[in-house]
């Protein structure tokens, strides 16, 4: 072999070796967890720091274990007394069991959103409009209780649920605005009358 050929041989061999070494190293952050799959089977867990795997045979799957926030998109729901309200919420959750989160559900965030929507629809459907507008804390606690129980099988803990907005029908909004205006006018008249009283 010529010197030039030897140079290219060792260069290509070095590049291949470097590529394999880079592929063999998996860095996991402190806030992550994960599993190592070899030919489709779980063979171990990823730990924070540097993990060594066999390239092309092992597949690392990482999961963020910090608290995450996801919006539940606004949707129209029907109350027990057939009023239509638009409700949206936000869910705070975190993965507590990496193995369940990876193996038991395909996409836990998507599953949480769908579960929250159907659960919220059921809760709102069991209440009358007046209750829905006045019992936001009850709705939050009921939704949290049900979601946390159901997502336990996925290795997810629901930490907090907040209903952001409950938007009543237009006719109800108009009636509420008129009532508030009437109350302001009444207070103003009382204050004005008290100001005119002789001492």
Swiss-Prot record:
One of its GO terms (cellular component) is plasma membrane. It is a single-pass membrane protein. The chain crosses the membrane at residues 7-27. SMART domains: PHB. InterPro entries: Band-7_stomatin-like, Band_7, Band_7/SPFH_dom_sf, Band_7/stomatin-like_CS, Stomatin_HflK_fam. Coiled coil: none annotated. PROSITE patterns: BAND_7. It is found in: Membrane. Keywords: Membrane, Transmembrane, Transmembrane helix. Belongs to the band 7/mec-2 family. PANTHER family: AT06885P-RELATED, BAND 7 PROTEIN-RELATED. This is Uncharacterized protein MJ0827. It comes from Methanocaldococcus jannaschii (strain ATCC 43067 / DSM 2661 / JAL-1 / JCM 10045 / NBRC 100440). The lineage of its organism: Archaea, Methanobacteriati, Methanobacteriota, Methanomada group, Methanococci.
């Amino acid at each position: 072999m010529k010197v030039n050929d030897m140079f290219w041989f060792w260069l290509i061999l070095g590049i291949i070796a470097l590529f394999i070494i880079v592929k063999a190293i998996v860095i996991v952050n402190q806030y992550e967890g994960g599993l190592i799959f070899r030919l489709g089977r779980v063979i171990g867990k990823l730990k924070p720091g540097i993990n060594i795997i066999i390239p092309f045979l092992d597949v690392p799957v990482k999961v963020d274990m910090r608290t995450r926030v996801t919006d539940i998109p606004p949707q129209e729901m029907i109350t027990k007394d057939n009023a239509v309200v638009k409700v949206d919420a936000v869910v705070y959750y975190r993965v507590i069991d990496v193995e369940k989160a990876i193996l038991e559900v395909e996409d836990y965030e998507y599953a949480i959103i769908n579960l929250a929507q159907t659960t919220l629809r059921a809760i709102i459907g069991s209440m009358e409009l007046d209750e829905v507008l006045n019992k936001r804390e009850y709705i939050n606690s009921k939704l949290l209780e049900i979601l946390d129980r159901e997502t336990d099988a996925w290795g997810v803990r629901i930490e907090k649920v907040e209903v952001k907005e409950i938007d009543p029908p237009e006719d109800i909004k108009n009636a509420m605005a008129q009532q508030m205006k009437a109350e302001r006018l009444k207070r103003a008249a009382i204050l004005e009358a008290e100001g005119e009283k002789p001492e």
